[in-house]
Structure formats: structure tokens, C-alpha cells
Design a protein with these regions (language model features):
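Iron-sulfur (Fe-S) cluster-binding modules
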Residues: 1-67, 75, 79-91, 105-118, ...
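Short, well-ordered alpha-helical microsegments
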Residues: 99-102
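N-terminal glycine-rich "phosphate-gripper" loop used for MgATP/nucleotide binding
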Residues: 93-97
């Protein structure tokens, strides 16, 4: 899922300071699951904004807080918010950057304030309360060849053909040895599975055209004009 983190309150207050009417919108997708941007966090942010304005002696503030199913879906975002957004000049979004941009596109006359920083695509370890980056959406997945461990993301240099000379005792030289070397993990995994032929396979440099930004997917393919 998309991993995000709430921005420092000072930053949110600064972006919202000129508005007397604010709509705070959470997202029931990724940011809600990781307890950063759902209904509950929207209500908490509402209380904090009200408190901040009171402390500054500025009493006139109307805030509504709610959450919608997904902010990254054009139709869901526009149908869920169409009636409520009209009463507010600004919306504070607790969704990832995709949600914020979807709202900005659907409601171009409103100021959309991002309240979270989008970090990465990652895995949640609920027990440890940690998130780990696992995929960089490279557009050409090679996990089948690497024992389900992504070298593009988990190797600090995104190497494709085994470890660099910097690994020491299974640890990566980047990051002061705190992370495992992805290629040692891959080697061990493939060895366990008796698949070391995949480890020695030579992989050509990647074709980065598949991950040029901005990418698109789906829709009807354009019909090519036939030459007369
Ligand atoms: S190879 Fe890695 S970055 Fe590419 S799609 Fe697979 S998991 Fe994601
Ligand atoms: S030590 Fe391992 S994980 Fe780190 S950059 Fe080299 S190959 Fe990649």
C-alpha cells in the first residue's frame, strides 16, 4: 500500500491560516489503514485546528471533517464531495499525493491543502509498528527470478546481477550497515529453493522507457491512421 506520514502540525496550520471555513477530508484507503488519514485522524485534526485558532484568539472558524472511500478515484471523489465542498473555499486532504491531485483536478476552484507526506509503496509490520519500502513500481517485475525479494527497491544501488563489493557480513555498505544486503537475501532465498541458476543468470540493463514519467495504463488504444 501507499505509505504516508502526517505533516508537522505547524506546516498544516501555516497552509490553512487564511481560511475561516475548512473541509477536512480523510481517505478510507491506504492512509486510513495505516492510521494516518482516515475519519478518526480527520476529526483529531479538526479539534487541533480549532484549538490552535482559539489559542490565537481567532474564534471564527467553521470546520467539517469526514472521510470518503477513496480520494484517488475520480468518480468516488467527485460524487462523494460534490455537495459538501461547495460551502468551503479550501479542503485539507489526508490522502496520498494521488488523492490530493484528484481533488485539485475535480474541484479546480478550491484550494487543496495536503496534510500528509507520501513516502513510498511499502509493507506494514503491525507488530513492530514499522513500514518498509518494498516496490518502486518499475513496470517490469522480476520478483519471479529473485526469490520474491526486489533488488530494484531493496538494494541501495538497484543492482540487477548480484551484490556489489560493498556488502560485509550480509549487510549493505549504504546506510552504515543497518540494512541487509538485498542480494545476499536473494542468494539465500534462491539457495533454499534450489534455484541458484536464477542467481547466476545474466540480466541486461533495464529498459527505463517502461517507467518514464508520467505513465498511463488502460483505455482504448488509439487507432493508427492507415497509409493511403
Ligand atoms: S521488480 Fe521490484 S520495483 Fe519492479 S515491480 Fe517488481 S517489486 Fe516493484
Ligand atoms: S551491499 Fe548489497 S544491497 Fe548494498 S548496494 Fe551493494 S549489492 Fe546493493
Amino acid at each position: 500500500m501507499i505509505i504516508a506520514q502526517q505533516k508537522p502540525l505547524k506546516e498544516i496550520f501555516e497552509m490553512a491560516k487564511n481560511f475561516k471555513r475548512l473541509l477536512i477530508v480523510g481517505c478510507d484507503g491506504c492512509t486510513s489503514i495505516i492510521q494516518v488519514g482516515g475519519e478518526k485522524q480527520a476529526q483529531v485534526l479538526k479539534s487541533l485546528l480549532e484549538m490552535e485558532r482559539r489559542l490565537k484568539g481567532k474564534k471564527k472558524l467553521t470546520i467539517e471533517a469526514s472521510s470518503i472511500l477513496r480520494q484517488c478515484d475520480r468518480d468516488i471523489a467527485s460524487t462523494s464531495l460534490r455537495s459538501s465542498v461547495k460551502d468551503y473555499p479550501a479542503v485539507i486532504s489526508l490522502a496520498c499525493g494521488v488523492g490530493v491531485q484528484t481533488l485539485a483536478e475535480q474541484f479546480p476552484d478550491k484550494i487543496i491543502i495536503p496534510a500528509v507526506d507520501t513516502k513510498f509503496i511499502g509493507m506494514h509490520d503491525t507488530e513492530a509498528g514499522k513500514f518498509y519500502e518494498m516496490c518502486r513500481a518499475c513496470g517490469d517485475c522480476i520478483l519471479f527470478e529473485t526469490g520474491g525479494i526486489c533488488p530494484i527497491t531493496r538494494c541501495a544501488k538497484s543492482l540487477l546481477n548480484g551484490p556489489c563489493g560493498g556488502q560485509a557480513k550480509g549487510k549493505c555498505e549504504v546506510g552504515e550497515g543497518k540494512n541487509d544486503c538485498a542480494w545476499i537475501l536473494i542468494y539465500n532465498r534462491l539457495k533454499e529453493r534450489n534455484k541458484l541458476d536464477l542467481f547466476t543468470k545474466f540480466r541486461l540493463p533495464r529498459d527505463y522507457r517502461v517507467s518514464e514519467h508520467p505513465r498511463e495504463l488502460g483505455g482504448e488504444p488509439e487507432e493508427k491512421e492507415e497509409k493511403a
